[in-house]
Amino acid sequence: MSKEMEKKIQGIADKIAKEFKPEKIILFGSYAWGTPNEDSDVDLFVLKKDAPNPRELSGDIRGYLWSAKMAMDIVAYNQEILDKSLKKGNFFIRNIITKGKVLYER
């Protein structure tokens, strides 16, 4: 990933952190794994422990970042859903948590 793109992605994470105050933001997918191409989107996992409706939070974050004009996929979880997913052995979530790049942590 280029330094310019790295700065852009970190800036997006900083905006999310400031506006939504999550516990953690993790970059996953092709940008985190070092395999982006011209069609890649930015994949972000956002953990907000007390989010009553994580799906709604994902939509709110997407709306907030609309002006960034960048293809993004936002996956938001609260602590309860994260714990259940990890307990069930959800490979997708475990992969994000163990191999993703932490951009923000409170």
Write out the residue ranges for each language-model feature.
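Short beta-strand->loop micro-motif that forms the acidic, two-metal-ion catalytic signature
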Residues: 43-47
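Conserved H-loop
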Residues: 30
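Catalytic core of pol beta-like nucleotidyltransferases
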Residues: 1-24, 33-38, 48-106
